[in-house]
Amino acid sequence: MPPKVSVASPGLLLARIRAAGGLTRQALLQETGMSRSTLYTRLDQLLGAGLLVESRSGSPTGGRPASMLTFDAADRVVLALDLGHHLARVSVCSTEGVPLAERRVQTAASGGIADVVASLSDIGHELLDGFDDQLIGVGVAIPAPVQTHTGIRWRSVALPDADYPMLDDLRRRFDTLVCLENDARALALGTLPDGVELGDDDVLLAVKFSTGIGAGIMTGPAIMRGSTGSAGDIGHMRVTNGGAVCTCGARGCLAATAAGRSLVRDAARDDIATAEDLRRLYQAGDPQVVELVTSAAALLGRTLAGLAHALNPAVIGIGGTLGSTPGVFETIQTTIREFSASRIHEHASVRLLDHQRSSVGLARLVTDTAFSPTRVDAMLDE
């Protein structure tokens, strides 16, 4: 008999229902071992607060319709700000990350990060027009190491001003919950489709290959952030002796050899200034760019093969401006297979991730935070 699931509060009960994508009352009675009266009292609290919705569906056996309890996502939206080195995407999403309104904007302009946040906030307010009182929070992905729960972030090329109070500024502008996350970890959080969960022992590795290179790692349902918020900072793994100086000041880093910023440097052409330029010219078959990007993708693939032996992932997701480019993705995928043992690569699903997966990850992060057991229990006690 499987162990009973501990749901000692209404908040934990809601978390279990959300994780399962919906459960019947009978399934909850079996899973939790709670008495019918106790369970129904807690469900009534959640239903009364508008956190659950109950719907009936036909029984496949023709018997009495089952009553399915699901999280009430209606009239709830998340604002996702996905900041890159040169581009940002501002999206109003459902709690599942489905885009309802979106705009892509340039961020590589004069001024600092405070000016960028001000501009993106203005766009966010424009996109939120028509979603009055539906915003549950703002999710922000940035290309820098960040301690999600404190908002402390480390200096990076894209965000050199580590002292700028980004969280406080955004809270003031939107008067709501704000969640800050590393961009590669946001990608990891959004990698799996809705309703698909990792097993407790499964590992997911998501990699963003763009202007920079970074990774997000999940173990079971948990995202790995590390003691300083730097877990997954694979761009600064040393992959060669010598070479160009990295932005971190060292030599031999993966990013200094293979990241989009480094390929722009190596191309040394007036028509190549960003990873978007590299993607465009790669797709056009430009010989120099194809050679540069293919070589970088192969090096990244070898690095990921090594990580795969350390992590034994069930899923490897590849995204970013360059990583999601057809041809580049296949090079990475093939190289992972070539440089890893069959017991590793034959049991790992390598997936191409489009740009929307980061917004999905931010929507999940905000929703999980806004409706965490602690917050839900406090809400019901008010």
Segments from the language model and where they lie:
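Glycine-rich phosphate-binding loop of actin/hexokinase-like ATP-binding domains
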Residues: 200-257
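ATP-binding/phosphotransfer module of carbohydrate and carboxylate kinases, centering on a glycine-rich
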Residues: 1-57, 61-129, 133-134, 254-382
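Short helix-capping/turn signature of helix-turn-helix
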Residues: 19-20, 194, 210
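Short, acidic, Ser/Thr-enriched surface-loop or helix-capping motifs
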Residues: 94, 148, 218
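Glycine-rich phosphate-binding loop plus the immediately following alpha-helix
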Residues: 180-184, 239-272
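Short glycine-rich anion-binding loops that position phosphate/pyrophosphate groups of nucleotides
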Residues: 58, 143-146, 210-212, 322-323
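Short glycine-aspartate micro-motif
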Residues: 78-82, 135-139, 204-208, 214-216
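Glycine-rich phosphate-binding loop and adjoining helix at the ATP-binding site
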Residues: 99, 106-203, 327-338
